[in-house]
Amino acid sequence: MTEKLLQMMQEKGYFNQHKKVLVAVSGGADSMSLLHFLYNHQKDLDIQLGIAHVNHKQRQESEYEENYLRHWAKEHKVPFHYSAFSGKFSENAARTFRYDFFKRIMKEADYSALVTAHHADDQAETIFMRLLRGSRLRHLSGICDVRSFGTGQIIRPFLHIPKDQLPVTFHFEDRSNSSLAYLRNRIRLTYLPTLSQENPKFKEHLCLLADEIALMDKALEELTKDITITDLSVFQQQTDAVQHLLIQSYLESFPDLQLSKGQFNQLMSFLRKKTSGKMPLKNGYVLVKTQTDFLITKEEPISLSSPSLLEFGKSIVFEEYLLTFSEPHVVSNVDTINIWSDAPIVIRHRHEGDRIDLGTHHKKIRRLFIDNKISEKDRQKAIIGEQDGQIIFLYVAGRLYLKKRPKNAILYGTVVIYKKF
């Protein structure tokens, strides 16, 4: 089985882009199996290991386990990174503490990936737990084997392997794993074994379901990539079913905003109406809707505010930027724009149908956002400069897009954009 595991990892290319990887090790069976496997196959996978361990200070044995791992790391010449949990303990608080610690070590010690020992049984448990809690369909895709994390990626190379097929090695037993006081333990020790008596492949089928949902979600993302979700004219042209999926996708940007079915339906009803306004949501969030756009935010965004007028010799503050319009000059390390007219410049956010003359062609601002993969958040903050009824510059996500220089034009002044701190 070890050779099959190695072959699978190589075929999937989990470590092709990584040299230094940080292995999360608790001392339990799964993480110790992962540690020994990766250590024994460092050359095959062309990686260098580091160990990250968090002592949660909840069991007497934790000190011994920490010392064992520290000694093992020293003996095998593997860097050992350690932290002790502090504060009021809960499962969520401990998880947040662990992953914040992992991110910090990745950044400080230049690891490009965190590797964890989640396996197929963990995947089945996660999906079943979400089913019990009434999660939406897209959340039943379960755990990803590779995704962005911190300054690199998190990789779960065992995710498609059942626990009973993992290499067996020395490990510590956490007695809390056998306590039925925890839902996940009840799922692992009671619910899934009972259902597996009806169908021995029940856990496997849960994982296959997750794979199908993940594929469907990926297909939806590709099919809707050119749709600006927060553009009302575009959104309202879609069918009810597509609108439903688009808003679910948009809500993924707000992980601490978990709407009930009733609240979700109210949100959809509000978006389908012709009226503008604000709708309070949960956790301090509000849905803000104008005649042309909408967005969810914790504060009413400047992107829905009135335009400002920038005149020659003056400065204005717009969002987190200070813009000045003065005599032609060069300023190092800031964004500068040459201006070919003395007319005041309207500083605003985008409107439906905005276009800019890039020289070789006119381009819709919306299409420019799509082609350059500008995020929804950055689109809302994009700054447009309009002079004499024409867009002369677009500033978005730290990038400038300029209107073609007028023929035979004489340089009149310079606009400088400073980021405020």
UniProtKB/Swiss-Prot annotation:
- Name under which the protein is recorded: tRNA(Ile)-lysidine synthase
This protein's UniProt keywords: ATP-binding, Cytoplasm, Ligase, Nucleotide-binding, tRNA processing
Q: What is its EC number?
A: 6.3.4.19
Q: Which SUPFAM superfamilies match?
A: Adenine nucleotide alpha hydrolases-like, PheT/TilS domain
> Which residues does the record give as ATP binding sites?
S26, G27, G28, A29, D30, S31
The broad enzyme category this protein falls into is ligase
Q: Which GO terms describe its biological process?
A: tRNA modification
- Quote the function comment for this protein: Ligates lysine onto the cytidine present at position 34 of the AUA codon-specific tRNA(Ile) that contains the anticodon CAU, in an ATP-dependent manner. Cytidine is converted to lysidine, thus changing the amino acid specificity of the tRNA from methionine to isoleucine.
Which catalysed reactions does the entry list for this protein? cytidine(34) in tRNA(Ile2) + L-lysine + ATP = lysidine(34) in tRNA(Ile2) + AMP + diphosphate + H(+)
The record comments on the domains as follows: The N-terminal region contains the highly conserved SGGXDS motif, predicted to be a P-loop motif involved in ATP binding.
